[in-house]
A protein has these predicted regions:
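N-terminal targeting/anchoring "stem" of glycan-biosynthesis enzymes
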Residues: 2-526
Length: 526
């Protein structure tokens, strides 16, 4: 039922299998008559033992992992590192006389647009330009979404005042009193992952010539990996501080998190098993789909997957999302039991009349989503003009604030990748990223009875022992700066010199930031 946590599910699950009152009384009278009082205790003990072993065999049990899961509910060790992007070098000066205006149109999904905003701010800084409030592409959501419907505009502008100038709209003219020109932004398409030098030369030249340039589309059009640490710190200031959601979204998130926490700690899972995602990944066969309407939706979608690879091959190398059943097996192997409260983020997961979630729900019945926790009236409170982005925005915040976050498919998934980085920034919060390439063969062997339960548990935990669960670590080849902003956006008092040394008092002149921000995220962000 929408708007209610399913306390009844927990009660029903706990009481499952209990015998009714009257049949049990009749059975008890019969046993006393047949056996007599002397053998009754022995008989009762025998019944209890049979019942116990029967329950043990009802579903997969991973007993040796039970104690392991407790460590995941705590944050990972910080090793003396703390988030810090407020510190600026002496060379970092407030914006000077502007070279012109930068207009950007951010395309893609919710988090891809968020990353594009971060890149737009940095591009404006590189060119010493005035940034016009970024435009959010609504073709993806087919609604009237706009920046003010999702983010706190005034807070965004104020937070970045010492980094870039931001205006809400493009003025009609620009220039000195005697040399003003009518602004007509020059359309420019930057190369993918363009270098800072491209903005300092090609883009800046056109800006000075026309007074304004418009970069469209603008998503992955500024290199992620830059040697300039100050540039990377600016990205963190935008992503983790300036991009604060509107009051409506933050208030709704606060209600959702409060209701979840009333049940205890909770885990969030970004379950990428929507039909659209499977189609784009080139993995429709993993669903065993028979519904004609669903198959038609698959056929209408373009795939970004390598057409030379069959779906089974993509799956074997980890290019397909984990199935809900595999997610359940993964959780059991890691030591979580069926009392674990799980918040599912992502789109609708179904197969016509059959739910893909049934196997996962059978193992973990306490599954919640935005629609099951929030009341319809509460969802209606949010600005209707931004409804296409509100769901992902709330999901993002609920996942950010969860005790454990598990993304089942991180590529390509800006949502998961950006969340992993932000959870790292706000106190090294636990993230378990399943190694799909290593795990899928194990799940397949288990499905085919090649691997026993105990062997599956040991193998899964061995695979995951090689993965970081959220502590500070160097970026590997598969991680971008947005996935792992360490060490650029962190500091340590153990570092005696250099830009990663924690200052005695951080520069907080234009940030809602304090030394213990990562410990007070809920108070500050929600």
């Amino acid at each position: 039922m929408a708007g209610r946590l399913h306390n009844g599910d927990r009660t029903m699950h706990d009481s499952k299998g209990r015998l009714g009152g009257r049949p049990w009384k009749n059975c008890w009278s019969l046993m006393k008559t047949v056996l007599g009082k002397r053998w009754l205790p022995v008989f009762i003990l025998l019944i209890c033992l049979i019942s116990y072993f029967h329950r043990m065999n009802e579903r997969p049990r991973f007993l040796s992992a039970q104690n392991e899961e407790h460590k995941f509910w705590s944050t990972a060790p910080s090793l003396g590192w703390r988030s810090s992007c407020a510190q600026r070098s002496s060379d970092w000066v407030p914006p000077r006389k502007s070279n012109g205006y930068l207009v950007v149109s951010c395309n893609g999904g919710f988090t891809q647009q968020r990353v594009a905003i971060c890149n737009a701010v940095l591009a404006a800084r590189i060119m010493n330009a005035t940034l016009v409030l970024p435009q959010l592409d609504n073709s993806f959501w087919r609604d009237e979404s706009a920046f003010p419907g999702i983010y706190d505009v005034d807070y965004f502008i104020t937070t970045l005042k010492n980094d870039v100038r931001v205006v809400k709209t493009l003025p009609t003219t620009w220039g000195e009193e005697q040399k003003r020109i009518r602004l007509n932004p020059f359309q420019l398409s930057p190369p993918r992952n363009a270098s800072a030098e491209w903005y300092e030369t090609t883009a800046l030249e056109k800006m000075k010539e026309h007074g304004a340039i418009q970069l469209t589309p603008f998503s992955h059009h500024l290199a992620v990996d830059l040697d300039n640490q100050e540039y990377q710190r600016l990205r963190c200031r935008v992503n983790y501080h300036a991009l604060r959601f509107t009051n409506d979204i933050r208030n709704l998130t606060s209600l959702i998190v409060e209701r979840l926490r009333s049940e205890g700690p909770y885990m969030s899972i970004h379950l990428r098993f929507e039909t659209d995602v499977l189609a784009l990944a080139g993995c429709p066969e993993v669903t065993d789909i028979t519904d004609e309407d669903v198959l038609k939706r698959f056929a209408e979608k373009e795939s970004y997957a390598d057409e030379d690879l069959e779906s089974s091959k993509r799956r074997s190398i980890g290019d397909c999302p984990l199935t809900p059943r595999e997610v359940g097996l993964f959780l059991l192997a890691m030591g979580f039991d069926n009392s674990t409260l799980i918040y599912l983020a992502g789109g609708k997961v179904d197969n016509g009349s059959k739910s893909f979630l049934d196997p996962l729900r059978a193992m973990f019945p306490l599954l919640e989503t935005l629609s099951t926790v929030a009341m319809p009236a509460e969802l209606a409170l949010v600005n209707e003009e931004a409804h296409g982005l509100v769901g992902p925005a709330v999901d993002y915040m609920v996942c950010l604030l969860s005790d454990i976050f598990i993304p089942t498919y991180d590529g390509p998934s800006e949502f998961a990748n950006n969340l992993i980085g932000q959870r790292l920034y706000y106190g090294f919060r636990t993230t378990l990223l399943p190694d799909r390439k290593a795990l899928v063969p194990l799940f397949t062997d288990f499905q085919n009875d090649v691997l026993q339960i105990s062997d599956l548990e040991a193998s899964v935990r061995k695979v995951m022992s090689r993965k970081s669960s959220g502590g500070p670590h160097s970026r590997d080849n598969l991680e971008s700066f947005y996935t792992n902003p360490w060490p650029e956006c962190f500091c340590s008092r153990a570092v005696t010199n250099g830009s990663n040394h924690c200052p005695v008092k951080a520069d907080t002149s234009n940030l809602s930031y304090d030394e213990d921000l990562h410990e007070n995220l809920a108070d500050w962000y929600v």
